[in-house]
Amino acid sequence: FKMKLSYINNEYFQKLISIEIDPKVKNKLISDMCRINILHMICCAGSGHIGSSFSSIDLMNWVLGEINKNHENLYFFSSKGHDAPALYNSLIAYGKLDFSFLNKLRKIDGLPGHPDVNTPNIFTNTGSLGMGISKSKGIIKANRLKGIKSKVIVLTGDGELQEGQIWESLNRVSQENLNELIIIVDNNKFQSDRSVKITSDLNDLESKFKSFGIETISCNGNDVNEFSKAFETLEKSNKPGILIADTIKGFGVSFMHGDKLEEGEFYQFHSGSISQDVFDSSISELSKRISDLTEKHNLDFKIELSNYETPEISLSSNKKQSLLASYSKSIVSLAEQNEKIVALDGDLILDTGLIEFEKKFPNRFIECGIAEQDMVSQAGSFAKEGFIPIVHSFSSFLTSRPNEQIYNNSTEETKVIYSGFLSGLLPGGPG
């Protein structure tokens, strides 16, 4: 199969950046232009995260396009990492990454699926979630020792706030007067599978952050009129700041908007690629909005899309075998035979095949959110109480982050089963 794609060439970004217009209008135009190229990039790769890229691109472009002008040493990076296609396209738009990388997401000698320091103007690797604020603190303190004035802006996700390291890292931010720091929360209300509220509700985020003594503002993170004022207020405060950016997952393409889903419904554009029809509809909607905005402001600026056809991909076999489907049936069958089996999940119910288990045994399905250490320790107690807990996550998360908790469980000489998915060197579909 192959796809017929469209993208916006670099010359249009450079022309728009050079035009003297209201920065807010420029932000809207560049962000929608980036959304077109994000879709192109992800479809070329066959994998990527559209929803979180679309929710955060407006904020990224404001930081790199406007806030960057006021700081000689600005560090800006993403802690959540899923929005790498957005970050790459924002860097490309502002000349910080070569345009030739547009077709090279998840390719050898191209751009990695998550940010990596071997990519120009990427300051930190984004691995498991929760590390970004800690890394920001280290950057600030190191620059202070060197006598260099810096500004550090780190973008986190709302699902990411379920990781314990986030709350450890906030403890001394105010105490140490880290006024160089601004933390952005892309509060798009959805994570890998379902809404944050259902998975692991964060409740009153603003009050939580303020309890750490950190200046905190909430605003619409997809409305440049709101978040530009919020950034200005935080910068003038001369205190460490947190911007809770209330965004919409998939913002920019109406049928991708997460806020239209029913309670408990799965979001379809978190990871992976899209069909030709979905691509065409998305490009049409984005192109029209760009055209309408340029006409509204009487801009001498018209975009012509460039076309690109992906190489033909021949599948070696038409027979598909799904290990996930087999696993799903097997764990349900085992649970039917043994009422002591419980399944614990770390916000990966789709990718670990637990949907049928949850439907059939809702009381024996334990959703833990993005909190592997908590999940593993809960499993240890289930085992101590005579149950057979089966713990589910991606192997890369399950083998390292809760290693001490796994060790502790093993010293209790109980039976806990750890089921790790997507082991291996090559990236899986979810990215």
Indicate where each model-derived feature is located.
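Glycine/aspartate-rich loop-and-adjacent alpha/beta segment that forms the canonical ThDP
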Residues: 4-10, 208, 224-312
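N-terminal capping segment at the start of a domain
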Residues: 31-47, 186-188
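Cofactor-binding active-site loop characterized by glycine-rich and histidine/acidic residues
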Residues: 38-41, 53-175
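Short internal beta-strands
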Residues: 76-79, 180-187, 191, 344, ...
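Short acidic, glycine/serine/threonine-rich loops at helix termini
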Residues: 88-91, 164-167, 193-197, 229, ...
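Thiamine diphosphate
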Residues: 116-180, 349-427
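Conserved thiamine diphosphate
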Residues: 147-148, 197-230, 412-431
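Non-catalytic terminal/interface segments that mediate subunit docking, oligomerization
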Residues: 294-389, 395-396
